Amino acid sequence: MSLYRTFTADDAVEYARQYGGVSQPQTLVTAEEIGDGNLNLVFKIKDEAGISRVIVKQALPYVRCVGESWPLTLDRARIEAETLLTHARFCPQHTVTVLYHDPELAVMVQEDLSDHRIWRSELVRGADYPQAAAQLGEYLAQTLFHTSDFYQHPHEKKAAVSQFTNPELCEITEDLFFTDPYIDHERNQFDAALTPDVQTLRDDRALKLAVAGLKHRFLSKAEALLHGDIHSGSIFVAEGRLKVIDAEFGFYGPMGFDIGTAIGNLLLNYCGLPGLLAPREAAAGRERRLEDIRTLWQTFSARFLALSESDCREPALAESGYAALFLQQVWLDAIGFCGTELIRRTIGLAHVVDLDSIQETDARLACQRHVLSLGRTLVLAAPHIADVDALLARVRQSGA
């Protein structure tokens, strides 16, 4: 019989007292439910002074934004905790600390990050964290390299692929990224004024063939343990610091998916800034986003190549020059996946405030059309975008 029950605020406080690692657990007295995502309950556990000390996160057995009509496995809580613990082995400085997790209750206690801010919110208001892109590139390099065939023994890797099999959450990604936006589906959400633009995408056979190839790679390439949902809303930043959270979509998949999703969210902000800020501030912010993209990729690729020189355990993959060839394919994948992220965040189920918070209707529609056009371009032109300089040139040429 399952021990699972949905936590109340009082349950969360009591759980944090037991498992939060606080020196004086009796000082934990209140819980504030802060979850604004689609899948979980999230509580800030506060002491008598009102200071948040730890976070208690519990998976719900359904998609929160839809309700019980869309059930979900609770095993995703185990996968999230084990993904974060695995990533923390190789990049502790940029992975949220998991203090305790219980698969039966689908609950996890993790460090409080109240001194950090959600990166997406900071980007939307025009704030700059100049080290964040390099730190994210470091996180991606360390976690993807050390969970790949370059580092893991084949037996260990095959066991890990099984351990992190995540079919229900992967199905959500498969549908929301690669299927729903290109058909008439009830989950899609977009302004009626975009209907002609959406229909143009759905009628574009070349685009849909390219998206089919991306979906096939997502389904079949078990290259490394991905975060699986690495967007600017799952990243916390502070002065000189960055922490990645929310890894319930973790699974073994193509490295380019994590990288492309991260780049895609920087481009969503790039496209939205003209509708969010005054012209001069928007122009400056856009230049920073392009520099962030350059820094992210250059940091990732340089670190990955360095690790392949120093830590590769597979003799065949250690052959001089192979890692660089491999990264060329990762880059190609990343550009394509980036394009699908742009499209699905504009006309699919899960939108972003980088676009939706633009108050003026015409400005918002212009930014959304820019995103759709750029997303299509990246999906189709990925084989011809050889490096990050070529990507940034394409973005600059995309207008708006």
Curated annotation (Swiss-Prot):
Keyword rRNA processing appears in the UniProt entry: no
Pathway(s) of this molecule: Amino-acid biosynthesis; L-methionine biosynthesis via salvage pathway; S-methyl-5-thio-alpha-D-ribose 1-phosphate from S-methyl-5'-thioadenosine (hydrolase route): step 2/2
Highest taxon of the lineage: Bacteria
Record SUPFAM superfamilies: Protein kinase-like (PK-like)
Keyword Transcription included in the entry's annotation: no
InterPro entries (alphabetical): Aminoglycoside_PTrfase, Kinase-like_dom_sf, Methylthioribose_kinase
Cross-referenced Gene3D superfamilies: 3.90.1200.10, Phosphorylase Kinase, domain 1 (3.30.200.20)
Disulfide bonds, paired cysteine numbers: none
A GO BP annotation: L-methionine salvage from methylthioadenosine
Keywords for the protein's UniProt record, in alphabetical order: Amino-acid biosynthesis, ATP-binding, Kinase, Methionine biosynthesis, Nucleotide-binding, Transferase
Gene Ontology MF term list: ATP binding; S-methyl-5-thioribose kinase activity
Chain residues that bind ATP: N40, K57, E111, D112, L113, D246, A247, E248
Pfam families in the record: APH
Residues given in the record as substrate binding sites: D229, R344
Leader sequence segment: none
Subunit comment: Homodimer.
Protein role: Catalyzes the phosphorylation of methylthioribose into methylthioribose-1-phosphate.
Protein name from the UniProt record: Methylthioribose kinase
